[in-house]
Amino acid sequence: MMTNWNFNKANKPLLLVVSGPSGVGKDAVLARMKERKLPLAYIVTTTTRTKREKETEGVDYNFIRPAEFQQLIGQNELLEWANVYGNFYGVPKAPIRQALAHGFDVIVKVDVQGAASIKKIVPNAVFIFLMPPDMDELTRRLEHRLTESPESLKRRLATAPLEIEKLPDFDYVVVNPEGEIDNAVSEIMSIISAEHCRINPRSIEL
């Protein structure tokens, strides 16, 4: 029997990947986390799509030209990238490495396709699926967003059930009903706390 010990819990930084279907509220949840000044490093996705009216360069996305995006691919400077609905999205590696080196938990927001790509490269990341309570609410959110053409809306609604089928590939699920963002944020922070209490902590290598 061990009667004397000196236990120091390892505090290895985490790479958290938040994903879910379009319209589930990924941007809104992360924005609320930033408002609450939670101690996380938020990685800004790079994209070639057009900036929406209320989006801010360098905050919501890094908006670049397709030629610049292709250059990043050629330099192997993207953790993952994908063509989503005709636009390119990618996660830059450099800020992730820097944040992890300084001991910060890193949070990345990607679509479901992107999460699958990251899991192949960094299987020890923490994968969180943000889930709508039902399809009707997801449809209402996309319609009220007023940023989608009829064709784009139809495509996103058709894709959502296929994305939700990927739920078993994730570690955790957080349901995000309309008007309950703070609950979703609290659940994500609980996941982070639990991960830091693991007997065998995750080790992230890029």
Curated annotation (Swiss-Prot):
Q: Report disulfide bridges, numbered on this chain.
A: none
Instruction: List the GO terms this entry assigns under cellular component, sorted alphabetically.
Output: cytosol
Family annotation (Gene3D superfamilies): Guanylate Kinase phosphate binding domain, P-loop containing nucleotide triphosphate hydrolases
Q: Where does ATP bind?
A: 20-27
Concerning Pfam families, the annotation shows: Guanylate_kin
Task: Give the primary localization class.
Answer: cytoplasm
Q: What is its EC number?
A: 2.7.4.8
Among CDD domains, the record links this protein to: GMPK
Q: Where in the cell is it found?
A: Cytoplasm
EC supergroup of this enzyme: transferase
- Family as reported in the entry's similarity comment: Belongs to the guanylate kinase family.
Q: Tell me the function of this protein.
A: Essential for recycling GMP and indirectly, cGMP.
**HAMAP family listed in its UniProt record:** Guanylate_kinase
Give the protein's recorded name: Guanylate kinase
